[in-house]
A protein has these predicted regions:
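Mid-sequence helix-capping/hinge segment at a functional interface
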Residues: 1-32
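A short acidic, often aromatic-flanked loop/helix-cap motif at beta-alpha or helix-coil junctions
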Residues: 6, 83-87, 143-149
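Short secondary-structure boundary/capping segments
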Residues: 12-14, 44, 129-130
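Short, basic/glycine-rich phosphate-binding loops at helix/coil junctions
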Residues: 20-23, 67, 150-157
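Hydrophobic beta-strand residues in large extracellular and virion-surface proteins
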Residues: 21, 52-53, 75, 139, ...
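Aromatic-acidic/polar surface patches that form glycan- and anion
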Residues: 32-35, 166-167
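Donor-binding and catalytic core of enzymes assembling or modifying cell-surface/extracellular glycoconjugates
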Residues: 36-121
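Nucleotide-sugar donor-binding patch of glycosyltransferase catalytic domains
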Residues: 78, 109-182
C-alpha cells in the first residue's frame, strides 16, 4: 500500500478481517458495462467471504452505488466520499480490483494491485489492457458469438446486437477469477 486507509473507511471495514475487493462496475459506454443483474450476482457471491468497496464517479453512478451498497452485506460505496488522492490511497490497499475496461482498472494496476477486467466489445490486444496484469484476468466476451470484437478501441462503435456481448461472461466465471486473484 502507498498509504493507509482513511480513518472513516477503516471503521466501515471493521478491522479488515477479510480481504478487500474493489469493484468499479461502470464504463464510459454501455457496451463495456456489465448489467446490473449480473453485477449483483457477482457481488452477492463475493460479499459472503470478502469486504467490497464500490468505485465510481458522478452523481448518477454515486447514487446507484450507494443503493447497491445499502442492499448488500459487507459492501460499501466510496463514490463521492473522498477526494481523488484518498481514493487512490484506498485503491492501493485493495487485494484485487474488478473493473470494466475503464480507468479504475488502470489506476489500480499502476498502484500494483491485481486487476480482473471485463471486456465487452473492446479487447485487451488493442493495447489498452491494465499495466502488468496476468492475461488470464482479462475476461472476454464470447468471440464465437461475437466474432467482430474488437469493434472499436473505445467501445463507442459496434454492430447491431453487440451491445450485450459483455453479458456472455458468466457471473460464476467472474467470481472465480476474483477469488483466484486473491
Amino acid at each position: 500500500p502507498t498509504k493507509q486507509y482513511p480513518f472513516s473507511i477503516l471503521k466501515a471495514l471493521d478491522g479488515l478481517s477479510a480481504p478487500v475487493i474493489g469493484i468499479a462496475p461502470f464504463a464510459a459506454h454501455t457496451s463495456k458495462t456489465y448489467s446490473k443483474s449480473n453485477m449483483e450476482k457477482v457481488i452477492y457471491e463475493l460479499q459472503k467471504e470478502y469486504k467490497i468497496l464500490l468505485f465510481g464517479g458522478g452523481t448518477e453512478e454515486t447514487e446507484k452505488l450507494q443503493e447497491l451498497a445499502l442492499s448488500s452485506l459487507n459492501v460499501f460505496s466510496v463514490a463521492g466520499k473522498f477526494p481523488l488522492g484518498e481514493e487512490l490511497d484506498i485503491i492501493s490497499n485493495l487485494n484485487v480490483m474488478l473493473s470494466m475496461d475503464s480507468s479504475n482498472g488502470h489506476l489500480a494496476a499502476m498502484l500494483g494491485i491485481k486487476v480482473v477486467t471485463l471486456w465487452g466489445v473492446t479487447h485487451p490486444f488493442a493495447g489498452f489492457a491494465p499495466f502488468n496484469q496476468e492475461p488470464i484476468n482479462n475476461l472476454l466476451a464470447d468471440r464465437i458469438e461475437y466474432p467482430r470484437i474488437p469493434t472499436s478501441i473505445y467501445g463507442n462503435i459496434f454492430p447491431k446486437g453487440y451491445e450485450l456481448a459483455i453479458e456472455t461472461i458468466h457471473p460464476e466465471v467472474v467470481v472465480q477469477a476474483v477469488k483466484n486473484s486473491l
